[in-house]
Amino acid sequence: MPRSLKKGPFIDIHLLKKIQKSLKLTNKKSIRTWSRRSTIFPNMVGLTISIHNGRQHVPVFITEEMVGHKLGEFSITRTYRGHTADKKIKKPIK
């Protein structure tokens, strides 16, 4: 369900401070964050943000198409390992 328009987009304060600090510096180092709930703003375009997926930080390069989406949408938390194979041993028919 989308957020109400009268509330506006959400971003964690600590993440916003990290982004502003990174934009002032010349080196474009990756920003580590655990805030998957934060919305991507236009001033984040061009930055690499490492988003925590519960186990590790996944680096994501922010593009213009990502603006308005949440950071958590680009860091998958679940791994699908496929269905297990049938372990019944087939006996040869005599």
Curated annotation (Swiss-Prot):
<dbReference type="GO" id="GO:0003735">
    <property type="term" value="F:structural constituent of ribosome"/>
</dbReference>
<keyword id="KW-0689">Ribosomal protein</keyword>
<dbReference type="InterPro" id="IPR020934">
    <property type="entry name" value="Ribosomal_uS19_CS"/>
</dbReference>
<comment type="function">
    <text>Protein S19 forms a complex with S13 that binds strongly to the 16S ribosomal RNA.</text>
</comment>
<dbReference type="GO" id="GO:0000028">
    <property type="term" value="P:ribosomal small subunit assembly"/>
</dbReference>
<dbReference type="InterPro" id="IPR005732">
    <property type="entry name" value="Ribosomal_uS19_bac-type"/>
</dbReference>
<keyword id="KW-0694">RNA-binding</keyword>
<dbReference type="GO" id="GO:0005737">
    <property type="term" value="C:cytoplasm"/>
</dbReference>
<dbReference type="InterPro" id="IPR002222">
    <property type="entry name" value="Ribosomal_uS19"/>
</dbReference>
<protein>
    <recommendedName>
        <fullName>Small ribosomal subunit protein uS19</fullName>
    </recommendedName>
</protein>
<dbReference type="GO" id="GO:0019843">
    <property type="term" value="F:rRNA binding"/>
</dbReference>
<dbReference type="GO" id="GO:0015935">
    <property type="term" value="C:small ribosomal subunit"/>
</dbReference>
<dbReference type="InterPro" id="IPR023575">
    <property type="entry name" value="Ribosomal_uS19_SF"/>
</dbReference>
<keyword id="KW-0687">Ribonucleoprotein</keyword>
<dbReference type="Pfam" id="PF00203">
    <property type="entry name" value="Ribosomal_S19"/>
</dbReference>
<dbReference type="GO" id="GO:0006412">
    <property type="term" value="P:translation"/>
</dbReference>
<keyword id="KW-0699">rRNA-binding</keyword>
<comment type="similarity">
    <text>Belongs to the universal ribosomal protein uS19 family.</text>
</comment>
